[in-house]
Each structure stands twice: as C-alpha cells, then as structure tokens.
C-alpha cells in the first residue's frame, strides 16, 4: 500500500488553533461503516447514538508540560521535549539545538534558566537527561515547562492550554499530546451518558511525540511505528467481556484507546482480551482485523498519517476518504482542537485494500 493513497487536500483555514468555547459544542460527523452513510450534527448527539449497556473506553492519560526552553552551558539555545519520564530525576527527550549536546554536557533550563540538568547519553533520536534538582521531574515540568501543542497549531502555548489541552477525566501524567477525541467530553455530557446507562472504562496510553511524526516511507508496510506505554487493567478487561456477553458495543474514545484495546487483544491467549501493561508499537492499517472495537469516536487526522490509516482499517478506505472529502467541503474544523467523528465498524473493511 502506498502512503500517498491517504492524502487529501486540506485548506489551512480548516486547522483549528483554539477549541470551541464549550467542550461538547463541536460538530459531529457520523459515518455508518456498513453502508458509508454520513450524517451531520453536534457532539451532544452522541448521547442519542449510544444504547444503554454500551461501553465507552476512555484514555485517562494526562498531558505534562513537556516542552522546555533553555541553553547549553556552552552558550547555544536549546529546546527539550520530554518523551518519557524514567524516574524522579531522569527523562528521555527530543532535543533541538544548532548542535546536539554531547554526553556530560550541562544544560540551563527554563525561561529563566534556573534549573540545571546534564545530558547523560543518547539513545538513537532520544537524549537521556538528568535534572540536578531536589524536586521530582513532574514538579520541575509543572514549574518551567510549556504545554506541548502540536506543530500544526501555529502559536505559542497559553496558560489556558494547561486546562483546555487536557481531558476533564485525565488522571495519570505522562503524555506529551492529548488524546484529543476525549477533549469534547464535559461533565454534563458524562453525567447524561451515565444516567442513560452507558458504561465507562479507562485505559492509559501515554501519547508520545511520535504521534505527530510524518510517515517518511513510500510504502506503508515499511513504516516503523513508535513505541508508547499502555495499560489495560483487569477491570477494563472485565468490562469489555461483560459488554460483549450482553450483546452491546465497545466504543473507543480516540485512536489511543483503540491501540490500547487492540494491543491487549493481540497479547491475549485463548480469550478475546487480557490485561496489558507495557510498550505497544501496534500499527493498524487496511487489512487489519479488529478484534474488540465496535464503534469509534475520533477527531479528523492529518493526511498520510498513521491515524487516518487506522480509521480506514475500521470504516473502510473508500468510506473514510469520502467522509474526509465531505468534511472539507462542509468546513469541519480539523486536528486536535477541531471537530469529531462517530464511526461504526465496517465488517468488510479488512478486505478493502487501496491501490
């Protein structure tokens, strides 16, 4: 399969740089996976598309203020984007500077250069950095870090982003990008869903910066997926199995919930799904057989991204690309702060290979 098969024309004006005033106030494009039918509405329509006993699976990761500015002790400016917290003093990070720091280099971090750190080692594209500070890493990041807005949001982060670029149910710090489908859920909608009898469960996948990396190969099968840490605990497994047993649907909120659940299914032996704790590099594209998910809530994704490939594997390639063309024509807002889709599974999608 060619990466170019997943491109589409997107006017810059449709890229959302700020969220809606109300989280649940965005538009919702619904795609019936079986026949490709499209319906236009608002996000709160989701309440009427779900049935009592259906299970919504959310990702409860919390975005950390992972972007830090500073300079090398030798003088050059540096930008650090924390990819993963290793312990209370060390992180793995992407580093941008005119010249990459060498092991043993001292760094002065923060807008006021008040935090000292040392570059310990390089691991492929990531740098291991140790903070020389009495505070735990998370406290340091909360003090000097900036919210890591995606590269297509062409503006500096603002204080408001610390709340807006965070789901209302986030619990476990560790992500450097928000699970953006979840940004549309506010407390009134969550209450209404519970009152209707919709079940909820929470996985954790700490979204890494790799989610924004372009696919740099021509052929999809040649792409090497980045690793992200995921947790699917026993209570989620029990909720999924109970949902399936009563004939209801498992609905993933966001592609990160999809990847978590499908990773847990792949790791299971002699059962549909089992607890999963570890790194996942699952890469879902047309031809993949979904094992757990029946419906999906998701935002609109970048052209030629692994995420539009995941959606195509779920809804069918033709249905997906036609839906995106319609979304552009109807001027839906795209990407992290944009509008949403509700998609039901296309049972024939795995057999639809583009090209």
UniProtKB/Swiss-Prot annotation:
InterPro entries, sorted: QueA, QueA_dom1, QueA_dom2, QueA_sf
GO BP of this protein: queuosine biosynthetic process; tRNA wobble guanine modification
EC class (word): transferase
Localization, UniProt: Cytoplasm
One Pfam family linked to the record: Queuosine_synth
Keywords tagged on the record: Cytoplasm, Queuosine biosynthesis, S-adenosyl-L-methionine, Transferase
The reaction(s) this protein catalyses: 7-aminomethyl-7-carbaguanosine(34) in tRNA + S-adenosyl-L-methionine = epoxyqueuosine(34) in tRNA + adenine + L-methionine + 2 H(+)
A GO MF label: S-adenosylmethionine:tRNA ribosyltransferase-isomerase activity
GO cellular component labels: cytoplasm
Recorded metabolic or biological pathway in which this protein acts: tRNA modification; tRNA-queuosine biosynthesis
EC number: 2.4.99.17
Superkingdom assignment: Bacteria
Similarity annotation: Belongs to the QueA family.
Function comment: Transfers and isomerizes the ribose moiety from AdoMet to the 7-aminomethyl group of 7-deazaguanine (preQ1-tRNA) to give epoxyqueuosine (oQ-tRNA).
Subunit: Monomer.
Protein name: S-adenosylmethionine:tRNA ribosyltransferase-isomerase
Naturally occurring in which organism (per UniProt): Erwinia tasmaniensis (strain DSM 17950 / CFBP 7177 / CIP 109463 / NCPPB 4357 / Et1/99)
């Amino acid at each position: 399969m060619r990466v170019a098969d997943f491109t589409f024309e997107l006017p810059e004006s449709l890229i959302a740089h700020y969220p809606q005033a109300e989280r649940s106030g965005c538009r919702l494009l619904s795609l019936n996976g079986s026949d490709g039918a499209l319906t236009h509405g608002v996000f709160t329509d989701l309440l009427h598309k779900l049935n009592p006993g259906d299970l919504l699976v959310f990702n409860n990761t919390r975005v950390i203020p992972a972007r830090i500015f500073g300079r090398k002790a030798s003088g050059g400016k540096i930008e650090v984007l924390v990819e993963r917290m290793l312990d209370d003093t060390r992180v793995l990070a992407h580093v941008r500077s005119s010249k990459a720091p060498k092991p043993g280099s001292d760094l002065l971090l923060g807008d006021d250069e008040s935090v000292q750190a040392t570059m310990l080692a390089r691991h492929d594209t990531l740098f291991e950095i140790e903070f020389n500070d009495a505070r735990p890493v998370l406290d340091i990041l909360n003090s000097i870090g900036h919210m890591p807005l995606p590269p297509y949001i062409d503006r500096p982060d603002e204080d408001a982003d610390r709340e807006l670029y965070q789901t209302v149910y986030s619990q476990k710090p560790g992500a450097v990008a928000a699970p953006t489908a979840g940004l549309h859920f506010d407390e009134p909608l969550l209450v209404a869903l519970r009152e209707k009898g919709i079940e909820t469960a929470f996985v954790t996948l700490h979204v890494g910066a790799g989610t924004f990396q372009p696919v740099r190969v021509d052929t999809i099968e040649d792409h090497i997926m980045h690793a992200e840490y995921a947790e699917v605990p026993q209570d989620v497994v029990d909720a999924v199995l109970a949902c399936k047993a009563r004939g209801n649907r498992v609905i993933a909120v966001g592609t990160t919930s999809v990847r978590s659940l499908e990773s847990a299914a792949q790791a299971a032996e002699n059962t549909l799904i089992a607890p999963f704790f570890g790194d996942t590099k699952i890469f879902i594209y047309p031809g993949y057989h979904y094992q757990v998910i029946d419906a999906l809530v998701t935002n609109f994704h970048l052209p030629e991204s692994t995420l539009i490939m995941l959606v195509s594997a779920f809804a069918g390639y033709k249905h997906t690309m036609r839906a995106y063309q319609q979304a552009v024509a109807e001027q839906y807002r795209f990407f992290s702060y944009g509008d949403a889709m509700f998609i039901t599974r296309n049972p024939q999608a795995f057999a639809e290979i583009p090209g």
